[in-house]
Amino acid sequence: MIRSMRTAARAGCLQARAELRIAFLTPTFFGMLLGPCFLVFFANLERHKQIANTISGSAYALVGLLGSIGLLGAFQIMSEMFNERNDGSLLRTRTLPRGTESWMFGKLLSVSAVTGITLILGMAAGFFLFPDLQSASLADFLVLAASLVFSFVAFLPIGVALGSLVRSTWGFLISMMAIYMIFLGAGTLSPVSVFPKPLQWLTASTPIYWGAHAARSAV
């Protein structure tokens, strides 16, 4: 059993390496840069706000968005499962011994790497653009990195579950819109105090809110 698991992990690593080569060594890489650009763009929309009269709205929003980026990783997993189910790739992996496990392990590795690059680029851009982040120490950034890892791990099962449930294009589009609405609205861009009380309670019950809150607490 251990030998078969090791074989599945090795196959998953080969799959992840092939996918990452496509992601980083082809024009696809320029599309991947859109993620950090959008994060910085949405954060910059909040530049005229002050949070508690001490923190700029841009720094608050960017760190909150980065803390919730695990949800985008979950969306990536969902979209990969949807696309590869439709083109038959996922079905073919099921015919191989431990094919599903190796496929999932490879996807987790590749999505984690792409999400990590998005985080690094977004944080680097924010460090130079938003002065409030420049006062953070190395220890603060290490704590931030740890909170982001926990956020990513918390959201991945959601992506796998949605990928298993979504079977139609309409279902995929509805799930995508819901994910992006939650990503931008669950206390990531601005404090939930601007919402009505019932919506504040609903937002505070979501893991994305606590992911953003943990990231902001770190820095």
Where are these regions (language model features)?
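Residue-level recognition of transmembrane alpha-helices
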Residues: 15, 33-34, 65, 84, ...
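Alpha-helical transmembrane segments and their short interhelical loops
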Residues: 100, 104-183
